[in-house]
Amino acid sequence: MTERGGFEALDTCVHCGFCLQACPTFLATGDEADSPRGRIDLMRALEAGELAPDDPALRLHLDRCLGCRGCEPVCPSGVGYGRGIEAARALLATRRRPSALARVALWALTSPGTSRIVYALARMLRASGIPSWLAGWGRFRFAMGMLAATKGGGRRWKAVKGGERTPASTAPDRSRPPSSALLFRGCVMDGLFAHVHDATVRTLGVNGWAVREVPGQVCCGALHAHAGLREEARRLARANVAAFGDGAEPIVVNSAGCGAMLKEYGHLVDAAGFAARVRDVTEVLAAGGGPRPGAPVDVQVAYDPPCHLLHAQRITDEPLRVLAAIPVLRVVSFADAAQCCGSAGLYTLLEPAMSRAVLAPKLASLRTAAPQVVATGNPGCVMQLGAGLAADGVAAAVRHPVELLDESYRAAGYYA
């Protein structure tokens, strides 16, 4: 971390305005202060001492930032907006703690002891079916929809008749030992999306990877960094670096938000070697010749790229290559797919009105595209899109791409 703590990443901004149409909050409000360009002015003033940390306008517009980083790929000057906004939030957090709701959410979702109880209770509630019945608009009903969306399974698509057997040309190669990879489990993924971890291990196994779990790993620290709690994020980062050690094995992640954070450890705690090993599961599957083909699955899928996969990690084609390994499956395009869904970690809880405003145009586009499944690679996006679609009465499931590949492989006979 540099002496200026990340503010220097904003220095190259020349106020060209290319970022405006890439910013979901600017599109929602039309307010320059809710754009990256406007926020950079505010952050520069904060660093220079021209604005006090308790300035209401400063906090309003910085708190409204989703941190989606959609402005970064379109910026011709290479502004590191993501690092800048986290530096600003870290400075603000030294003067004012995050809100009570943010602190409670962090405690419930990421602290090891408490989160185990919280996730166990959430899984029990999810299994009861009550969240699905209560899903809708409004804070409580939307939260129920988010929980219902984490269930996974419940197949709404079928393998094409006659496609159940594995073609000889695609049978797993047992002539050489598998390569070794390490799985990063995370907190939300481990608590509510264990089925995605299982699908990750199985699909990687078909493609020649033996996946091991690593004891001692903890939360990636993304939610803490976004809240300005940089020292807590560093503590978690150091624990993960120590847990995974100095080997060369890739660290596989199936959460875009976690992956983006782990790849920032080089800047956060000078762990560039660790960061270089981090790979999204779709990167690993798509490497070389791409994933082995599975059985045909007759389903229409809309791929929604998570912001922290598309903008932060610049991963674009790999998830589509994973879906392309499923014969017959059709990927349909829809307008504004690259725009944020409004989830953004705790943002959907802390800024519900803006979160729903950002989500609205994406829901409208998905209604028009009419997919049977929306595929996306981040837990917050699965929950946000699942809750929004349910509230809107759209009968589309939301799944991680590896879940679809897993169904195809199961139908092909790679495993029972």
Where are these regions (language model features)?
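Non-heme iron-sulfur electron-transfer modules
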Residues: 2, 26-57, 78-103, 395-404
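Iron-sulfur cluster-binding electron-transfer modules in prokaryotic oxidoreductases
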Residues: 81-416
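Short, intrinsically disordered, charge-biased short linear motifs at domain edges
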Residues: 1-10, 51-62, 205-208, 326-331
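Cysteine-centered iron-sulfur cluster-binding motifs in ferredoxin-type domains/subunits
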Residues: 7-26, 59-79, 338
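Signature of N-terminal electron-transfer/Fe-S-associated modules in redox systems
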Residues: 11, 29-30, 45-50, 54, ...
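N-terminal glycine-rich anion-binding loops that anchor highly charged ligand groups
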Residues: 17-21, 31-36, 210-215
